């Protein structure tokens, strides 16, 4: 192979992560700061290959686990692609209008989208089987992450500080 060909191959290889070969010890255990009973194993694959405007994470959810405190984003799109789902893996959704939380069964190959501002809080839960998925979304300079079951909002400023606000203290204007 020529020197130019070797450089191209090295460049392409720097942009490839072989997720099927990732062992659990390659993934970080992410414990949710708003609800420590929620956690997932995660690798920021988008960061690893140099993405700056889109976040993409490879995630494994062990049996008997909830991935995150149910949430929705005001300014950021969020999506998930189910790589491998066992028989008892679920999308959890919380509808603020009805204040109900529902379980939606997941299957391998499902694609889920949560457009910015859609007031459907979401997360994943497993039973006896594990769940493997890609999770991603836009990286806006400002976002508000709503946690309806906890009664809090996290105001995210990617260029500065974040603020956690209890819903009871939120006053809308306009």
Kindly give the residue locations of the regions a language model identified.
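A short, N-terminal "cap"/entry segment at the start of jelly-roll beta-barrel domains
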Residues: 1-53, 146-174
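Conserved short histidine dyad/triad with adjacent acidic residue
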Residues: 39-42, 57-74, 119
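A short beta-loop-beta micro-motif enriched in histidine and acidic residues
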Residues: 46-54, 65-79, 99-100
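Short, conserved beta-strand element in jelly-roll/cupin
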Residues: 58-62, 74-94, 137-138
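Histidine-centered metal-chelating micro-motifs
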Residues: 66-67, 88, 110-113, 117-123
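Short acidic-glycine-tyrosine-enriched beta hairpin
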Residues: 95-116
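Ligand-binding loop in jelly-roll beta-barrel domains
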Residues: 116-143
């Amino acid at each position: 192979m020529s020197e130019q060909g070797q450089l191209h191959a090295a460049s392409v290889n720097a942009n490839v992560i072989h997720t099927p070969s990732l062992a659990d010890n390659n993934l970080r255990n992410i414990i949710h700061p708003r609800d420590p009973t929620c956690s997932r194993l995660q690798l920021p694959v988008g960061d690893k290959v140099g993405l700056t405007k889109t976040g993409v994470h490879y995630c494994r959810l062990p049996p008997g686990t909830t991935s995150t405190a149910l949430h929705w984003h005001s300014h950021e799109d969020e999506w998930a692609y189910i790589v491998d789902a066992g028989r008892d893996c679920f999308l959890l959704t919380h509808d603020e209008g009805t204040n109900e939380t529902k379980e939606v069964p997941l299957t391998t190959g499902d694609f889920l989208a949560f457009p910015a501002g859609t007031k459907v809080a979401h997360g994943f839960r497993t039973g006896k089987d594990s769940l493997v998925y890609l999770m991603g979304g836009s990286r806006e300079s400002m976002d508000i992450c709503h946690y309806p079951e906890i009664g809090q909002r996290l105001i995210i400023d990617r260029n500065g500080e974040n603020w956690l606000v209890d819903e009871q203290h939120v006053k809308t204007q306009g």
